[in-house]
Amino acid sequence: MQSFLLHCPPIRLCMGLACILFLWNAVSGLKGEGKKDKEMALPPATVSGNEGLKKEKNGSFLHAAESVFKEKKMVKGLEVLATTELPARSVDLSTLNLTELVNGMLNRALKDSKQFFSVLSITSYSSFAFHKVSVAIYNISNPKTVDPAKFPTRHCYCLSNRTNDLSDFTALLVDIVGNSTSYLTEIFKSTSILSVTQTNESDCVFICVMVGKSGRNLSDFWEMVEKSPVINYTFTSGVSSVLATTRGTARTSRLTTQSQQSLLRPYSVRWSTQWVSALKSLPWTKTSAPSEKELAESKQMFPELPVGTIGTHSSAPSSSNMTRTPWGTNRYTQAPTVPMPMPLSVDDSTPEGPPWASLPSTSASIEDAQQLRSTGNLLHPTGILTTPSRLAQPSRASGTLMPGTQTTNPTQAPAPRVPQTDGIPAEWPFIPEKEPARDPAAHQVSKCPRPLLQEEAITDTPLPLAMKKLTPCLMELCRFFQQCLCAIQKRDFSSEAISNCYLPEKIRKLITLH
């Protein structure tokens, strides 16, 4: 009994210690698990939050840096584009064939509602390797909402059974394209409204052009335009071979090569490829620089000289010498011993034509004109001022450039008729692949043709064959896109020219309504 009592307290003590130790271990284990849970839960959350904040900051910074980089890249691209713009003289618009375009417009107008209003949209792109000109025609759903202030200039062309030749109008369209691509850029350049209207009161089908320049900011204007174009043409061509023309070399001012001359012996009509640099060698070039006022006025009147425009010197006469760049720059190597005199005035009514044109007979020129009228091809796009190659060749009998008389007051000649040859120094050599420096700022153009004040007025080159079939009004349309005010300034127009310049009153009202 005593032994049992003696052994009882240690057992109880041991049992109590065991329970205490067990409880201690259990509590410490629970505390350890709680700490582990807290360590597993709280620290990762804080770490992820910090990383998220860092990522957000880095993302915004990267986005801002990326936007700044894109802006810098865009600015640099625009700068590069500005330095690599190719002028229009390096673009061969002879590949444009707008005959199908005009025929499609006529078929649409004659088949549907006798009225077809459309937008001629011209967009051009440029690079070192190619150029692309897109010509699209969009149908206008409601032409009455067109603001006439944005399209102030209107030109109409009457197409009837008597005037069924579309070469003049297609030449006008080519000139519009050439004017809009005066500097090829990657922006929207030009917009013109074309309308084809047929009325029962007249036998004419009026093709009207409302010319105006606009951009992509005219959202209200483009809302009324159908999304898909009715007619869409894209012309691509390489320009790497004509990059030398922008550097002022004389390669573009050559008339024809020997191979072309051999091909022209059967007197087939072949248009020589002449760029604006060749046409710019025609007008008078003043050696002294023009005043700032003249430059400002010329830039305000004509911001960009259209392709194929012949400019005439219209500044006041001065005592400075006026020299003229010859037509055939490096073609004259030797002059014949006996120079032939050259007349200073030419009568267009003479059947044999101008003496400097080496034509075999009048029948050949008539056949050429008929062939030009019969073919549906376009006139040469450099302002339809390009003559056939054999017409552009100077006569071999003309010899050296003879000095001619010069009036003290140069007039504003509308179109060249006589090749004026003023005093050119005999010691001026014609070096191949070189061309005398010209001052393009001195070229100014007149709005409308004015009658010559004197018989021996200063003029440039003979009137081309293609120019003769154009009425004076259409000549001015293709040149400057000015209104038909030619007949007001020049009163000796024929009735046919006046009928082309002045629109009928009903048609004028119809155009005003639209």
Swiss-Prot record:
UniProt-listed InterPro entries = HHLA1
Q: Which Gene Ontology cellular component annotation is one that this UniProt entry carries? A: extracellular region
Task: From the UniProt entry, list the residue stretches annotated as the region Disordered.
Answer: 379-420
* Coiled coil stretches, renumbered: none
Q: Tell me where it resides.
A: Secreted
Q: What UniProt keywords are attached to this protein's entry?
A: Glycoprotein, Secreted, Signal
As given in the record, the signal peptide range reads 1-29
**Per the UniProt annotation, where are the glycans attached?**
N58, N97, N139, N161, N179, N200, N217, N232, N321
Renumbered to this chain, the Polar residues biased-composition regions fall at: 384-398
Compositionally biased, Low complexity: which spans? 403-415
Name of this protein: HERV-H LTR-associating protein 1 homolog
The species this protein belongs to is: Mus musculus
